[in-house]
Amino acid sequence: MKMPKTIGLVHFIGIGGIGMSGIAEVLHNLGHRVQGSDQSDSANVQRLREKGIKISVGHKAENLGDAEVVVVSTAIKKDNPELIAAREKFLPVVRRAEMLAELMRFRNAIAIGGTHGKTTTTSMVAALLDAGGLDPTVINGGIINAYGTNARMGAGEWMVVEADESDGTFLKLPADIAVVTNIDPEHLDHYGNFDAVRAAFRQFVENVPFYGFGVLCLDHPEVQSMVGKIEDRKVITYGENPQADVRYHNVRMDGATSVFDVEIRRRRTGQVIQLNGLRLPMPGRHNVSNATAAVAVAQRLGMEPEAIAKGLASFGGVKRRFTLTGEWNGASIFDDYGHHPVEIKAVLRAAREACQGRIVAVHQPHRYSRLSSLFEDFSACFNDADTILIAPVYAAGEDAIDGVNSQALVNSIKAAGHRDAQFLTGPEALAPVVSKIAQPGDFVVLLGAGSITYWAAALPKELAEISGS
């Protein structure tokens, strides 16, 4: 049985969240009555309001109104007044992933999983399917620049979704195709240990039906280890690894555009398909790898090489994924969501490949718990930056941990051999410091999952005011 149109008014608690807003938008576009609430106004809230969705700012029991179904994310605590009121009324309370799963039942579904690269890969798969005329429905964990939103309703038979592994609920998603970009020891507060993370991703792939398949990155040791353990399901491997079914190679840079070749080898028939000179308007081998995952999916769905090449060449990127916010005195300023050492290292390596000058990295650590558990990795992930500015930790509601702070990170980075790491007192100090460092041709890359995105947006103007230009 699929979800009927007669479920009544659906209320989203925390509707402005990047995951919740996409589901609410698609549900609204399907003709369901949708409303919601959020702690504060935001771009996502404004966008949904413009579509006619009623949204209250602040959480109060009366916000429920005539709601018959309530959707919550894991960020909503049990003492939320709207959640309490919903349970007092005996209303069905649905987790975000459960509602996403219900939407997926209306389409053939592609779910993109992995501890890093999900959002970009989801966007790339959507872009290629668009270029192939498949007009997919998309629910992503980031704003796709080509759409100006993180969700869109397509008329085609395919849906592309980002599968969030953080709370284990991605195992509820009924995917026909499951992509795994990588597996790192993240979200151990939920899983308890890394073995449980490994087991979850294996289950994610084995959950696909017998007529579906998994698409797994052979370059990542944990994913490669999992490939041999997948039982009774079809698997397509991708990556730079010479053993991959879909292999990228001959990577070169044309300015900030990655140019590369892809070789597709069919195991059963021995057929080899060569796609040469693919162009992706993003730097970085990690982005080439993500693009190769999208190529693997698109080619298996029957897309022609010309459409694949067109889709990659016109890819508009994702908001907060190496997004140019402006320029000053010949230096380019970028905003990036990277907040894990693996992500930071990949972004800075990509910047190094594309930049003719020096790299100035500005990082706002996100959560004391993450900085504590990955402290050594954070100390060694900035090597491609010439100068590092470390801002105070964005706590995200956490309590401070003794000895775990930004100054300690700066000291550790220096102890590990970096020549120029500095503590940045806060956003008010950013422009004055950068104005003394940045030179024509340099890249200033702001990295983090907290408020640093606002600093990146404001920095070009603040620098111009300092210089009087």
From Swiss-Prot:
Pathway: Cell wall biogenesis; peptidoglycan biosynthesis. GO terms for cellular component: cytoplasm. Keywords: ATP-binding, Cell cycle, Cell division, Cell shape, Cell wall biogenesis/degradation, Cytoplasm, Ligase, Nucleotide-binding, Peptidoglycan synthesis. Pfam families: Mur_ligase, Mur_ligase_C, Mur_ligase_M. One of its GO terms (biological process) is peptidoglycan biosynthetic process. Signal peptide: none annotated. GO terms for molecular function: ATP binding; UDP-N-acetylmuramate-L-alanine ligase activity. NCBIfam families: murC. Cell wall formation. This is UDP-N-acetylmuramate--L-alanine ligase. It comes from Sinorhizobium fredii (strain NBRC 101917 / NGR234). The lineage of its organism: Bacteria, Pseudomonadati, Pseudomonadota, Alphaproteobacteria, Hyphomicrobiales.
